[in-house]
Amino acid sequence: MTTFVVAHGAWSAGWAWKKMHPLMGALGHTLVTPTYTGIGERSHLAHAGIDLNTHITDILKVLEFEDLRDVILIGHSYGGMVATGVADRAVERIAQLVYLDAFVPRHGDSLLSLTPADNRSRVLDGVRTQGDGWRIPANPLPSDTRTEDVAWSTPRRVMQPLKTWEQPIELMGAVDTLPRSYIYCNKFGPGDVFRQFADRARVQPGWKYFEMDASHNPHITVPQELAWLLDGIAQS
């Protein structure tokens, strides 16, 4: 049995992984899905000062207080920023890292610095016009998301503090010692932001590379297929 811990994506929260809990349990695994400060059921704690380090600390404290060790840490989308920071600071608790259609930062990167210029301009326009100058409005869900999943997800996706995307990550290099896997979801949306990280992972030593015939949120759209893939990674 393996314990998986999720660093979720932007605007999301632990709720988004609801379909995955019984599937991972049926495969003999434990899935832990914390929610970052200021999002989801913790959205009442939102304020302009929340940054990337806040979210990294959220996950670090779950590992510490639950005394979780030998975990597989999953970073989905924005959660790749968080998972990288967590693994670098708590490498002794992590067995391996899985990036699920996620950002893979190097020291000094921020999510905004890794975002193409046209996307970055659109994000900042949304912050100014809809987010009171400090919150990022949610992107639309992928077009292949089922109607019932759109209805379930949309009211739960809340705006995210801008500093979580602005703050550069600080890394000491410990994360580079861990086994890492990249799962690229090949039904990409406009811009295909994650192709750059998938291409890097495919050729770098120390990485395993996988593709899913899925759009950006396979934990919602194809949860069984994702559960099988994660089980295979755990056993490999």
Provide a role label for each language-model segment.
Residues 155-174:
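Active-site nucleophile elbow and catalytic-triad environment of alpha/beta-hydrolase enzymes
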Residues 35, 72, 95-98:
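Residue in the alpha/beta-hydrolase core beta-strand immediately N-terminal to the catalytic nucleophile
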Residues 182-184:
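Short beta-strand/loop motif that positions the catalytic acidic residue
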Residues 75, 79, 83:
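Gly/Ala-rich beta-loop-alpha elbow adjacent to hydrolase catalytic centers
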Residues 30, 36-71, 88-89, 113-116:
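Active-site loop/oxyanion-hole signature of alpha/beta-hydrolase fold enzymes
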Residues 2-43:
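Conserved HGGG/HGGXW glycine-rich cap/lid loop of the alpha/beta-hydrolase fold
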Residues 88, 93-94, 98-139, 193, ...:
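Flexible "cap/lid" loop of the alpha/beta hydrolase fold
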Residues 186-213, 217-220, 232-233:
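Conserved loop-alpha-helix segment in the C-terminal half of the alpha/beta-hydrolase fold
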